[in-house]
Amino acid sequence: MDNNVYLLRQLPDGPQVLIDAADAPERILELISAGTTPGVSTEKPGLAAVITTHSHWDHVRALAEVLSATGAEHLAGQADAAAMPAPVTVPLENGQQLDFGGLRLEVIGLRGHTPGSIALLYEAPGTPPQLFTGDSLFPGGVGNTENDPQRFGTLIDDVEQRIFDRLPDGTVVHPGHGRETTLGAERPHLAAWRARGW
């Protein structure tokens, strides 16, 4: 299964943050090493944190190895923490603000795909907001809720209220699988998603 992983850094020399250590730990560690600030003496690649968007197996296959190799903190939604294959050092809640040396992320809880699924919002002046949604929002719909109407209702409500009702159409959505999209491209389909129930 193809997954997206995202390595973020506040330029020029801020700490690196990884979103979803999904698979291929050796490749992820190569990317982290390539981004480590030259001249900084460190025994481990420079990674401040791994943020896991949710506890499903396809988003955590490289987690233990990346954490062990880097000594990074592990952040994830509070309600998913017990299901993670590696300890969560910083449990996250909706609305929490994170700051990694100037790289600021807002935690947006999107319950439904899993109880503790989160998205991460990055905003900077002069650029469109960047939203990392894990498996909660994709081009064409919300994440899988296993045909459970209650879980679907919770997820579509969270997606509408916490994302579409407050963020502009230019917001770029970076999902856990597949290509990116924008909120503007997806907004016209919200009613159809709700009507079909997935």
PLM features: residue spans?
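Active-site HxH/HxHxD metal-binding segment of metal-dependent hydrolases
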Residues: 16, 23-106, 128-129, 189-192, ...
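Core dinuclear metal-dependent hydrolase active-site scaffold
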Residues: 7, 96-125
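Metallo-beta-lactamase
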Residues: 14, 38-45, 115-198
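Short, compositionally biased "basic patch" segments
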Residues: 1-8
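Active-site environment of divalent metal-dependent phosphoester hydrolases
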Residues: 2, 25-26, 55-61, 81-84, ...
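Divalent metal-coordination and catalytic microenvironments
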Residues: 8, 20, 54, 66, ...
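Active-site donor-binding loop signature of nucleotide-sugar glycosyltransferases
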Residues: 10, 94, 185
